Amino acid sequence: MKWTFILAVAAGGSLGSVARYLVGIGFGRLLGPKFPWGTLFINITGSLLIGLFAGLFAIRWNLPQAVRIFLIVGICGGYTTFSTFSLDSFYLIERGEVAAAGAYMIASVVLSVGALIAGIQIVRVL
């Protein structure tokens, strides 16, 4: 484990998190709180961004690993972890593991929402 990688994640994560917060606030003010438009926008644009980075790293950009970590794990991860979920799903599909990709996508959504509900219920009981 290199400290430069940890610092790259921390720096990128802080920028991505601030961007997520500002976008969420902006959409909330613009469209109101009835539907999570900001979150939807963040998840879609974060997935697009990580796809662009992954594609550029694979075919065009020869950047140091710390810069790649800063952009993908840091900025994209801070902006939305949904982008990482999307990239992992794509990699499974690209490797021909379509059933595993489907199971991963369904399990991720269902189990994550289930875990959230469980967490809320635990707090309510306490």
Curated annotation (Swiss-Prot):
Organism source for this protein?
Nitrobacter hamburgensis (strain DSM 10229 / NCIMB 13809 / X14)
For this protein, what reaction is catalysed?
fluoride(in) = fluoride(out)
Q: Where in the cell is it found?
A: Cell inner membrane
Q: Does the keyword Ribonucleoprotein apply?
A: no
For this chain, one GO molecular function annotation is: metal ion binding
Q: Which GO terms describe its cellular component?
A: plasma membrane
What is the protein name for this chain? Fluoride-specific ion channel FluC 1
Q: Where on the tree of life does the source sit, at the highest rank? A: Bacteria
Activity regulation per the record? Na(+) is not transported, but it plays an essential structural role and its presence is essential for fluoride channel function.
